[in-house]
Amino acid sequence: MNEYGCNVCNEEYSARDPLKCPRVLTGCGHTICHNCAISIAGRNSSIFCPFDRTATQIPGGDLQNLKKNFALLELLEKIADGGGLLEKSGEVVKFDRYSKERLLNLECDEDSEHVAVIYCTVCDSNLCERCSESTHSTNVLSKHRRIPLTEKPPPLVHCRLHSSYVVEFVCKELSCDTESPLMCMMCRDYGRHKGHSHVLIEKEVEDLREKVREHLGELSKQSETIGNALHSIDSVIHELTPGQEDGSLEETRQEVRNHFRRLRTALDRDEEDAVETVDRYARNRVESLQTQKERLEAISSKIGNTCTTLQKALIMERGKILDRKDDLLALAESTAAEPTAVLDQSQLSTRIAFSFLNDRKLHIGDFIESRVVLLGLDGAGKTSIVRRLKKVQMDTVMAPHPTIGFNIETIHYKNYRLNFWDVGGLPKLRHLWKHYYSNAQAIFYVIDGYAVERFSEAIKELNRVMSDPLVGTCPVIVAVNRKDGYALNGHMDALLSQLEALPFQHHFHCCDAATGSGIDQIIDQITVCLSRLNGTCPV
């Protein structure tokens, strides 16, 4: 707050805002704003001064009837109208009516060490106050019209062909092939631009300046976006730079070391290998981010240079700015067209994803290979499920013929690369199943939910597979493939009872190969089981 504000709320007084109007407490003479008077008085018929507690009666019970501090209001209006500043010199208050002109910092034409604040319209000269008085002290010169420098009219541009005429128009004729679009009245009525469409030079200049302002606004936003991106990149680089105690890299290194300290002494070598893996990953990330940073810095520098050029263009004379119209607009448009895509939040994450498997090796950012065998009777929908996972079109999801032999499809899910082995389910092929599930990490067994009469056969084959010692601790997911909303009446309960009676653990799901419903949940269950089996550390 300056010295012209309310000492209660520290807000400046205003002649335009009713709530900031200065009100005089007649009981003591102090002044507060109208808004503070409302807060202090409440519904009372009197108001107590917040400075000396003197009571002032509110005329008619309405705070609007409290006297305004007109002296202060008049002073505020003078400051607003004149654009000047009030300065205290000892006990004397001095009003500077040329404060705006001083900000221009133009040299006085009489004395270059002085700052010009006045313009003489007759002499066409910029003068300081002292030189203005000294040079116009005679009776004749004192009649010259002198105005504040901020009110100086723009310089007139004279026609190149008719030097005694002032340029007043700009040619807008598309077929005009003259050197300059600027025209005076002679050019318009009798010269090269006769009959051409045209506009006033003031309008053309203002339109051009408006376009420049729009480009400046857009470029400022782009510059701000790039600035934020650079700040984020610097933050991530700081987090991933070795030696930064508060960085994510150091936190990850410490977690890795803590893990290996809990292991036997023989794991020391593996610990150092793991730390090197983290460092190498961080170096690669930093190199990639440095490349992105350099690209954005180059664009930011170009935008800054363009903005500087456009800012200078705004204060050019009319003729000069119009002469450079095409160059200015081309520069602004080419700079605005620069790609300013920034990294998304996932690319700026400082977390380092890692996991430990049974081989005691640290894995970062690589997919874990896993073999999943799909088993089931012929026609159960195994191939349709795999094709649905591969995003095959709807009309080709359902396989018209049973699988002869096997198909292999690879699905990427989370940090796993799941190799699905779709094995044929014809009776003559079932004795070959053991050659596929013997090396499997998971078994996905599919039952046709429409073939109720084959439920017992499907359960029998599943029990035969799980009784094989080759299966071992391999997780089993059992899925009933049926259409959503398809009623099995009491057959589903019977199927669940048979599954619960099996002497091994399994995970039960329902899915629809035609629509893909429920398949994502099954794949998620498979990866959860694989993570438990592998002893993967949570990321």
From Swiss-Prot:
It comes from Caenorhabditis elegans. GO terms for molecular function: GTP binding; GTPase activity; transferase activity; zinc ion binding. One of its GO terms (cellular component) is lysosomal membrane. Residues 369-539 are annotated as: ARF-like. This is E3 ubiquitin-protein ligase arc-1. It catalyses: S-ubiquitinyl-[E2 ubiquitin-conjugating enzyme]-L-cysteine + [acceptor protein]-L-lysine = [E2 ubiquitin-conjugating enzyme]-L-cysteine + N(6)-ubiquitinyl-[acceptor protein]-L-lysine. Keywords: GTP-binding, Metal-binding, Nucleotide-binding, Transferase, Ubl conjugation pathway, Zinc, Zinc-finger. Pathway: Protein modification; protein ubiquitination. A zinc finger (B box-type) spans 103-149. It is an enzyme of class 2 (transferase). In the C-terminal section; belongs to the small GTPase superfamily. Arf family. It comes from the Eukaryota.
